[in-house]
Design a protein with these regions (language model features):
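Cross-family detector of peptidyl-prolyl cis-trans isomerase
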Residues: 1-112
Length: 112
């Protein structure tokens, strides 16, 4: 319960509400995350205690859309259908074509 489904197929569940800024399309963000396949297999995660920093415009569509709904300090579980993730091409050896992906994302900081 508590799962929100958007028109584009993105699903999210708020694990912790944030109180800070909401990122816009050109912003840089710092996040902690864990990426899983639908069967629970972890395929990627941010370095412990540091997170990763990136420009919003440089990541997959589902991440851009989810992060622009989150506030700094928020911690969400996000489910991305293939069209919002890596689609038909997949990514590397770990993410096959047309895979639904599950991410836990904590938005640490937003920088303009």
């Amino acid at each position: 319960s508590g799962v929100v489904t958007l028109e584009n197929g993105l699903l999210y569940r708020v694990l912790k509400k944030g109180k800070g800024k909401i990122p816009a399309g050109n912003d840089t963000v710092q996040v902690h995350y864990t990426g899983r396949l639908i069967d629970g297999t972890i395929f990627d995660r941010s370095p412990q205690g540091v997170g990763i920093t990136f420009k919003l415009r440089g990541v997959i569509r589902g991440w851009r859309e989810a992060l622009q709904l989150m506030r700094e300090g928020a911690h969400w579980e996000v489910v991305l259908p293939p069209g919002l993730a890596y689609g038909r091409r997949g990514s590397g050896e770990k993410i096959g074509p047309n895979q639904t992906l599950v991410f836990e994302i904590e938005l640490i900081e937003v920088r303009n």
